[in-house]
Amino acid sequence: MKKDIHPDYHMITVKMTDGTEYQTRSTWGSEGDVMTLEIDPTAHPAWTGGQGRMLDSGGQVAKFNKRFGGLTLKR
């Protein structure tokens, strides 16, 4: 096996949308960083059976609706 070709794995903390946290090893960030999730399996409709709504924290849905809201399909 070649040396110094593998990424550096270190411990990070992942913070879920409900506030729970857990530690895992990752190549993301650096040792001790906190990854805050905006969407996770406890809040995403695909895993919750469609209950609840997804938060649009980046305004992407509003931006899409502003740009394409008046668009209609011609038949």
From Swiss-Prot:
GO molecular function annotation: rRNA binding; structural constituent of ribosome
GO CC terms in record: ribonucleoprotein complex; ribosome
Domain of life: Bacteria
Biological process, per Gene Ontology: translation
PROSITE patterns for the chain: RIBOSOMAL_L31
NCBIfam families, alphabetized: L31 (TIGR00105), PRK00528.1 (NF001809)
Subunit-level organization: Part of the 50S ribosomal subunit.
UniProt record similarity statement: Belongs to the bacterial ribosomal protein bL31 family. Type A subfamily.
Protein name: Large ribosomal subunit protein bL31
Gene transcribed to yield this protein: rpmE
